UniProtKB/Swiss-Prot annotation:
Residues 619-640 form the R domain. It is found in: Cell membrane; Golgi apparatus, trans-Golgi network; Endoplasmic reticulum; Cytoplasmic vesicle. Residues 232-244 have a biased composition (Acidic residues). It comes from Arabidopsis thaliana (Mouse-ear cress). This is Auxilin-related protein 1. Residues 46-99, 150-731, 749-776 are annotated as: Disordered. Promotes uncoating of clathrin-coated vesicles. May interact directly with clathrin.
Length: 904
C-alpha cells in the first residue's frame, strides 16, 4: 500500500491509515483547485494537533487529527472571539479571504491589538505525512499550520511564542523546522523570516550583544518614547537596505535553512521605523497588526527593564524613525561606535513619494506539478551600482548580489544575513541542511513541492527586483536624509555606533569577498556550462553538417545511380533498336542479295544461252566469213596479179611508145634546128634545168609509181602538166621531161639532173641564195622520205606483231565475251577479268548496274579507261592496245544495243 499512498489519496480519498475521507466540495472553483493540489500530496497529520478552525476542504465533523486534505496555503486558525479557547468563528468570515490570507492572528492574551478575520483554511501541514517533517507542538492554542505568507502580516514574537514555522506546511521539516527554536529564542532572533524579505515584519530582532551593551541600552532607554501606533504599516522592501547595513555571521552552511528563517535577522532598528520604503509597502494593509510583540507576549512599548540580550531588541526613543535608516555607503565608513545608534519612533511617515504595489504585480505560481526541478539556475541578478561617499574607502561590492550560497553564510541569529540572498538560494533550489545538522529528506514528492515553491519564490523575486529598481532612487535620497537625521540625533551613542559600524563593515567586506568568490565560481561554472553548451552545439552542428553531407552524398549517389540506370536502360534500348535495325537491314540485304543472286543466275543462264547461241552463230559467221574472205582474198589476189601484169604490159607499151615518139621527135627537131642558131639551140636545152620543176621523177617514172603502190593512171596523171601553166612553160616542161626521160633512158646520172647547176650571168648573191634553197629542199625531201619509210616499216612491223598476238588474245577475248554479246551490264560487271591491272579500272558489281543511269555512268568510265587513243597516250604496249581495241569495239556495239532497247 505504500506505493499507492498518493494514488488512493488522490482518486479514492483514502489516507495511508486506511480511513476513508469524503471528497471536498466542488462548489467553489478556487477551493477545488487547492483541494486538487492538496489531495495529490496527502500526508498524515501529526498526533496531538488540534485545529480551532473549521477547514474549508475537510469534513467539518472530523477533528484536527483526522485531516486528510490540506491546502498548500494552510492558513492559521481563525481568530478567537469572546474567549481564549477559540471555539467560535466569526460568522461573517469569508470562505476564501485574500486580504486575510497574508495576516497573522493575534490572541487576546498576547496582544491588545484588534483581531483580524482570517480565511477558513485547513490548518494541517501538507507535508506532515513525511516522518522527518513532523514537528512537535509547544502550544495547543497556536496554529499548527499557518499561511505560507503568514509572516508577511505576523510578527516574529508571535512565531516565537507559538513555536510554529510559517512555512511548515509548504516546505516541511527542512524549511519550517523547529528543532533549533530554543537556540533562536536565546539569540533573540525571529523563528523564520518571510518568504519575501521584509513582508510582515513589525520589529527587528535584537542583535547579539553582550550584557554591557544591553545595560547601556537600558540606561539609554529614556531617550525612547512610545512607539508608533499599533496599526503602523511596515515597509516590505526594508530588506534592501537592511541586507546592506547589517553584518553577517557565516555560522550556517545550509543555504536552504535561511529560507525557512526569514525573520531571524538582527538589526538595530525596527522594520517599521528603520525601512527606507516604510510608506510604500503595498501589502502593509493586508491586516498586519501594528504593535510589535516579543516572545513574552508584552506590548509594543518595551520598558528598559525588560530588555535582555537574548530576546528583546533595543528600545527605541522618539524621533528615531529616520535615524536607523542608514545607507549602504554609511556602513562602509571607517569609524567606531560602541553603542547602537538611536532610532526614530516619532511615527511619522513620508507620504509624498508613496508608490503602491498591488497583489497582481506579485504573481504566485504554485500549481502542483510532477516535473523535476530545473536543471540550471535562474539568470543572475544584475549588480547594482553603489554610491560611495567622498571620504569612504573603496570596498569591492560587486559580489554583493550572489546567487550561489557558500558554507560561510550568516546564521539564523546573524543580523547581517541578507534576506534577498536567502530568497536567491531558495529560488535556485539548492539543497540545504536543517538546523540540527542533518540533511533534508529527499523524495519524488518533495522534489515536486520544492520545484513549485522554487517557482513561486522565483516569481516573487522577479517582482521584487522590478520594485527594487523602481524604488532605488527614492531609497538613496531617503538614506541620505535619514543619515543626516540620525547623525544629528546620535549624541552619546557615537562610540557604540562606530564599533558596531566597524564590525558590520568588516563582516560586510568579508561577506562581499566571499560573495565575490562565489560569483567568480558561479561565473566560471556558467562559462564552463556555456563552453559545454557551445561544444555541444558545435558537435550537434557538425553532426548536422555531416548528416547533411551524408544526405547530399547519398542523394548524389542515388541520382548517379538513377542516371546510370537511365543511361543503361537507354543504352539497352538503343542496342535493342540497333540490333533490330541491323537485323532488318541484314534481312533486307539478304533479300536483295537473294534477288540479285537469282537475277544473276537468271542473267547468267540467259547469258550462257545467248553466249552459246552467239558462239555458235559467231562460229558459223566466222567460218562463213573466213571462207568468203578466203575466196575474196583469192579473187583479189588473182585480180591483183592480173592487174599487175596488165599494168606492166601497159607500162612497157607506153615506154616503148614514148621512146618511139621521143626518137621521132628528136629526129624532127633536130632537123628543124639545123637551121637555127646554135645558141638558141643550147639555150633551149639549158632552160629546163633552171625552170621550176613540179616533181623529181626517178629514172623510171612508171616504176616509181608502181613501187609506191599507185596505179598506172596515177603515174600518168603525175606526168601531166597542170592546166593553169602558160604555153611556153608547158613546152619547156615537156621538153625538160623529154630530156629527163632521155637522160634516164640513156643512163644519165641522177646527180647531174638533180644537182645544182650554175647559171651564167647571175650574180653571186642570187647564186648563193639559190644554192641554199636547193640544199634545204633536198634536206626536207630526204627527211620526209625517211620518215615516210620509217612509218611504213613501223606499220608493217605492228601489223605483223598484231597478227602474232591476235592468235592468243583473240581466244581470251572471245572466251570473256562469250554469252555477253550485246549485254552491256554483263560486259561492264566482268570487265576486270579481261583488262590488265595497270589500266586503273575498278570492278563494278552487277547490283550497281540496275538502273539505266548507273549503267550509262559506268560505261562512260569504261570508255575513258579503254579508249585506244587514251591507252596510246598512257604509253601502253602493243598487247594492251590490241586488247583495248577489241574490248572497246565490243562495248560500243553493246552500248548501241542498250540505247536502242532501254529508255533513260
Amino acid at each position: 500500500m505504500d506505493d499507492f499512498t498518493g494514488l488512493l489519496a488522490r482518486d479514492f480519498g483514502l489516507k495511508p491509515q486506511g480511513k476513508s475521507a469524503p471528497m471536498a466540495s466542488q462548489s467553489n472553483s478556487s477551493a477545488a483547485d487547492f483541494n486538487t493540489f492538496a489531495s495529490s500530496y496527502s500526508f498524515a497529520t501529526a498526533a496531538g494537533k488540534k485545529s480551532d478552525s473549521l477547514p474549508v476542504f475537510d469534513d467539518p465533523g472530523r477533528d484536527g487529527d483526522d485531516l486528510l486534505f490540506k491546502d498548500v496555503f494552510s492558513g492559521p486558525p481563525p481568530p478567537k472571539y469572546g474567549s481564549s479557547s477559540g471555539d467560535s468563528r466569526s460568522p461573517s468570515a469569508p470562505a476564501f479571504d485574500y486580504d486575510a490570507m497574508f495576516k497573522e492572528p493575534k490572541s487576546k492574551s498576547a496582544s491588545s491589538m484588534p483581531v483580524y478575520d482570517k480565511p477558513v483554511y485547513d490548518d494541517e501541514d501538507v507535508f506532515e505525512s513525511i516522518p522527518e517533517l513532523k514537528i512537535p507542538s509547544t502550544s495547543s492554542q497556536s496554529a499548527r499550520f499557518e499561511n505560507v505568507f503568514s509572516s508577511i502580516s505576523s510578527s516574529p514574537t508571535k512565531h516565537r511564542k507559538q513555536n510554529s514555522s510559517p512555512f511548515d506546511d509548504l516546505m516541511g521539516n527542512n524549511l519550517g523546522k523547529k528543532g533549533a527554536d530554543s537556540d533562536r529564542e536565546e539569540k533573540g532572533s525571529s523563528i523564520f523570516d518571510d518568504l519575501i524579505p521584509g513582508f510582515g515584519r513589525t520589529s527587528s530582532p535584537p542583535s547579539k550583544r553582550t550584557t554591557s551593551e544591553t545595560t547601556n541600552q537600558s540606561e539609554k532607554a529614556p531617550y525612547r518614547t512610545a512607539e508608533t501606533s499599533s496599526n503602523v504599516e511596515e515597509d516590505p522592501f526594508v530588506v534592501l537596505e537592511e541586507s546592506e547595513s547589517t553584518p553577517r555571521e557565516p555560522s550556517r552552511t545550509d543555504p536552504l535553512d535561511d529560507i525557512g528563517k526569514f525573520n531571524s535577522r538582527k538589526t538595530d532598528h525596527s522594520s517599521v521605523h528603520g525601512g527606507v520604503f516604510v510608506d510604500i509597502d503595498p501589502l502593509d494593509n493586508l491586516g498586519k497588526p501594528g504593535p510589535d510583540m516579543n516572545s513574552k507576549g508584552k506590548s509594543h512599548l518595551r520598558p528598559p527593564g525588560n530588555i535582555s540580550g537574548s530576546q528583546s531588541p533595543p528600545v527605541e526613543s522618539p524621533g528615531s524613525y529616520h535615524s536607523k535608516k542608514v545607507s549602504f555607503e554609511d556602513f562602509l565608513e571607517p569609524h567606531n561606535m560602541s553603542t547602537p545608534p538611536p532610532t526614530n519612533s516619532n511615527g511619522s511617515f513620508e507620504s509624498s513619494d508613496d508608490v503602491w504595489l498591488t497583489v497582481s504585480e506579485i504573481p504566485l505560481f504554485t500549481q502542483p506539478t510532477s516535473a523535476p526541478p530545473p536543471t540550471r539556475p535562474p539568470p543572475p541578478r544584475p549588480t547594482r551600482p553603489i554610491k560611495k561617499k567622498v571620504n569612504e574607502p573603496s570596498i569591492p561590492t560587486s559580489a554583493y548580489h550572489s546567487h550561489v550560497p557558500s558554507s560561510g553564510r550568516a546564521s539564523v541569529n546573524s543580523p547581517t544575513a541578507s534576506q534577498m540572498d536567502e530568497l536567491d538560494d531558495f529560488s535556485i533550489g539548492r539543497n540545504q541542511t536543517a538546523a540540527n545538522g542533518y540533511p533534508d529528506p529527499s523524495s519524488g514528492e518533495d522534489s515536486d513541492v520544492f520545484s513549485t515553491a522554487a517557482a513561486s519564490a522565483a516569481a516573487m523575486k522577479d517582482a521584487m527586483d522590478k520594485a527594487e529598481a523602481k524604488f532605488r532612487h527614492a531609497k538613496e535620497r531617503r538614506e541620505k536624509e535619514n543619515l543626516k537625521a540620525s547623525r544629528s540625533r546620535e549624541g552619546d551613542h557615537t562610540e557604540n555606533y562606530d564599533s558596531r559600524e566597524r564590525e558590520l563593515r568588516e563582516k560586510q567586506v568579508r561577506l562581499d569577498r566571499e560573495r565575490a568568490e562565489r560569483e567568480a565560481e558561479m561565473e566560471k561554472a556558467q562559462e564552463r556550462e556555456k563552453e559545454e553548451r557551445e561544444r555541444e552545439q558545435k558537435r550537434i552542428e557538425r553532426e548536422r553538417e555531416r548528416l547533411v553531407a551524408r544526405q547530399a552524398v547519398e542523394r548524389a549517389t542515388r541520382e548517379a545511380r538513377e542516371r546510370a540506370a537511365t543511361e543503361a536502360h537507354a543504352k539497352v534500348q538503343r542496342a535493342a533498336v540497333g540490333k533490330a535495325t541491323d537485323a532488318r537491314e541484314r534481312a533486307e540485304r539478304a533479300a536483295v542479295q537473294r534477288a540479285h543472286a537469282e537475277a544473276r543466275e537468271r542473267a547468267a543462264a540467259g547469258a550462257r544461252d545467248k553466249a552459246a547461241k552467239a558462239a555458235a552463230e559467231a562460229r558459223e559467221k566466222a567460218e562463213k566469213a573466213a571462207a568468203e574472205a578466203k575466196e575474196r582474198a583469192n579473187a583479189e589476189a588473182r585480180e591483183k596479179e592480173t592487174r599487175v601484169r596488165a599494168e606492166r604490159a601497159a607500162v612497157e607499151r607506153a615506154a616503148a611508145e614514148a621512146r618511139g615518139r621521143a626518137a621521132a621527135q628528136a629526129k624532127a627537131k633536130q632537123q628543124q634546128e639545123n637551121t637555127n642558131d646554135l645558141d638558141s639551140f643550147f639555150s633551149s636545152i639549158s632552160r629546163p634545168n633552171s625552170a621550176p620543176r613540179q616533181r623529181t621523177n626517178p629514172l623510171d617514172p612508171f616504176q616509181d609509181s608502181w613501187n609506191k603502190g599507185g596505179s598506172f593512171e596515177s603515174s600518168r596523171e603525175s606526168l601531166r602538166v597542170p592546166p593553169g601553166q602558160p604555153e611556153n612553160l608547158r613546152k619547156t616542161s615537156s621538153v625538160t621531161n623529154i630530156v629527163d626521160d632521155l637522160s634516164s633512158i640513156f643512163g644519165a646520172s641522177a646527180s647531174q639532173s638533180g644537182g645544182f647547176q650554175d647559171v651564167d650571168g647571175e650574180t653571186e648573191e642570187r647564186r648563193r641564195a639559190r644554192l641554199e634553197r636547193h640544199q634545204r629542199t633536198q634536206e626536207r625531201a630526204a627527211k620526209a622520205l625517211a620518215e615516210k619509210n620509217e612509218r611504213d616499216l613501223q606499220v608493217q612491223r605492228e601489223q605483223v606483231e598484231k597478227d602474232r598476238i591476235g592468235v592468243t588474245l583473240d581466244v581470251e577475248i572471245k572466251r570473256w565475251g562469250a554469252g555477253k554479246e550485246g549485254n552491256l551490264r554483263a560486259l561492264l560487271s566482268t570487265l576486270q577479268y579481261v583488262l590488265w591491272p595497270e589500266c586503273g579500272w575498278q570492278p563494278v558489281s552487277l547490283t550497281d548496274l540496275i538502273t539505266a543511269a548507273s549503267v550509262k555512268k559506268v560505261y562512260r568510265k569504261a570508255t575513258l579507261c579503254i579508249h585506244p587513243d587514251k591507252v596510246q597516250q598512257k604509253g601502253a604496249n602493243l598487247q594492251q592496245k590490241y586488247i583495248a581495241e577489241k574490248v572497246f569495239d565490243m562495248l560500243k556495239e553493246a552500248w548501241n544495243k542498250f540505247n536502242s532497247e532501254e529508255l533513260f
